[in-house]
Amino acid sequence: MKISRRKVVVLGASAVSASLLPINLLAQSDGQSAEDIIKEFTGGANIGSGDIMLTTPEIAENGNTVPISVESKKATAIKILALGNPGPDVVTFKFGPLSATRSASTRIRLRKTQDVFAIAKLEDGSFIQDIQKVKVTIGGCGG
């Protein structure tokens, strides 16, 4: 089978054009609002305050890599939410009964200056939260 020079040029141009299209599959929301996500996680229970510590930088120069850490001594699960992102549900950390520590650290993307929420489900079934405001100078979610 012979391939003409014209076909090669057309295929090459098509490939280059396709690579320039914005593909934000990971930053797309599945349509759930933050309230729905919280209600699903808590089962509609009240959220109090208590022994949970969310650590974030006050100012993030680059929203693509914002370091966070969260700790709660009696947590079985901790959900992180970034309400200013297209998809506010960032991550859920789960801890088993043999977990030595109930803490986690990661880097997240933040689209703009916003509040970051950490909601912990405790061993007794209650929920507590901590909120930190992060000022973002360069957004990280394609917005």
List PLM regions with ranges.
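Transition segment at domain starts
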Residues: A27-I59, D89-F93
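Structural beta-strand segments of beta-rich domains
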Residues: N64-I68
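Short proline/glycine-enriched turn/loop motifs at strand-loop junctions of beta-rich domains
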Residues: S72-T76
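An anionic, turn-rich surface loop/hairpin at beta-sheet edges
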Residues: P86-R109
